[in-house]
Amino acid sequence: MILDRDLNLEQFISVVRHGEQVELSAAARERIARARTVIEQIVEGDTPIYGVNTGFGKFENVQIDRSQLAQLQHNLIVSHAIGMGEPLPAEVVRGMLLLRAQSLSLGHSGVRVEVVELLLALLNADALPVVPSQGSVGASGDLAPLAHLALGLIGLGDIEYQGQVRPAADVLAELGLSPVQLQAKEGLALINGTQLMGSLLALALHDAQVLLGTANLAAAMTVEARYGSHRPFQPDVVGLRPHPGALAVAAELREFLAGSEIAPSHLTGDGKVQDAYSLRAVPQVHGATWDALAQAERVLAVEFASVTDNPLIFPETGEVVSGGNFHGQPLAVTIDALKVAVAELGSISERRTEQLLNPALSGLPAFLTPNGGLNSGFMIAQYTSAALVSENKVLSHPASVDSIPTSANQEDHVSMGAHAARQLRQIVANVQTVLSIELLCAAQGLDFQQLRAGRGVQAAYEYVRTFVPTLTEDRYFRPDLLRLRGELVSGELLRVAQAADTQAPAPAKLPDSGDEDRDTTSRH
């Protein structure tokens, strides 16, 4: 991939998860060099410019002698690399390297080209500085985590390479790379940015997009296992409140349910007036998550194309301006909203699991076991689901409403965006498990059906049964859950269901008007 002005989520994932190599475009090199020229001119003069020839934070009024400018940048990195906690996952660090290089390549930071090239060299070699997960307050950007990232460039700290954590200097030498000797402004440019929260958001957003599609599939499977009505998902119903997300979710539900033999079998005579909200209101609940994901993708697209440094260099005029582009609030607020939206996918999924396991609601054997009492079936699977849903409620508390002033009150409002982003990552992981539990239960519920489900649901059900057998007697089925969860996370289960829809003949017509009226009267 050629790194220039444009970077999208698909490209980000291709690099961070699939190892696509990255190089700077010629235009990016030129932009970087022009901004560097401005810094070199400043160094030759005596005008105090923040972060170039002054101290940092509360020390902004301390002017630094020209002979100490390189030491100033070195000191900045080593003093700020004070993060704690478990190391960030490899994919998160890859994302930080890519996004920092992307921001610097826009040509408003004043670094030399070789600094950006070293970032990309580490990324392409998958030689990843060890970055602790805790220590960012989200303004000025992700200072401590990015300082740990920068340590690797100057040959300090540790780098994980080929499965081993080793001193950075040793890994650089093995790769034939030289540690960079930071010059004026370069240390500050490396650590002033939102790349930790940006990387975490990008990864979580991608996973949440897959998660939403799978949540729609799980809901459709539960609707079929529970003899639920399809009528609330029809365009005339959802179209009366046409939020984009609700329309999109309803359309996908109709695709998964098309061709069902189950729905026509219970249009009348089952005694139900309407389904529970967790079945009937899936377009509205999942649709709200769809809308939140769409907004997050818009915010992320802007962030990918942004310069989050301070001060900013304007090569056309030679101006150097202190601004607030480093502040993480645009991301933090978006992430907090996404936390709630994704957590709700788990909350409603757990309620659908209850609809499957409770015989008073489902008409199916209690806990989906044919021999209850001796066997407990899926009873405790719901406990796990409930525990994770409850945990998500705590994690969903907004981090961006909190702020603790830092740097002697010079930096008096911060975003806590990285904290929110780490919470979002955990929420996504928890919901992946909650939905896997629903899918296990829904597949078991379909085992009691004699008719075929909608094409997408049926394909997913049959695929699940290739690696998870029907539960006839109690067994240790955590491995089954883990395997199914893996298929969910990879997106393979969703692809199977979607492929069945695209390869199928045109969906069958809805029942004749008389049947449709009966369905509306008895089930809506």
Curated annotation (Swiss-Prot):
Post-translational modification: Contains an active site 4-methylidene-imidazol-5-one (MIO), which is formed autocatalytically by cyclization and dehydration of residues Ala-Ser-Gly.
2,3-didehydroalanine (Ser): modified positions: S140
Gene3D superfamilies named among the record's database cross-references: Fumarase/aspartase (Central domain) (1.20.200.10), Fumarase/aspartase (N-terminal domain) (1.10.275.10)
Main subcellular localisation: cytoplasm
Entry's EC annotation: 4.3.1.3
Annotated InterPro entries: Aromatic_Lyase, Fumarase/histidase_N, HutH, L-Aspartase-like, Phe/His_NH3-lyase_AS
A GO BP annotation: L-histidine catabolic process to glutamate and formamide
CDD domains: PAL-HAL
NCBIfam families per record: hutH (TIGR01225), PRK09367.1 (NF006871)
Protein name, UniProt field: Histidine ammonia-lyase
Organism: Deinococcus radiodurans (strain ATCC 13939 / DSM 20539 / JCM 16871 / CCUG 27074 / LMG 4051 / NBRC 15346 / NCIMB 9279 / VKM B-1422 / R1)
Gene (name only): hutH
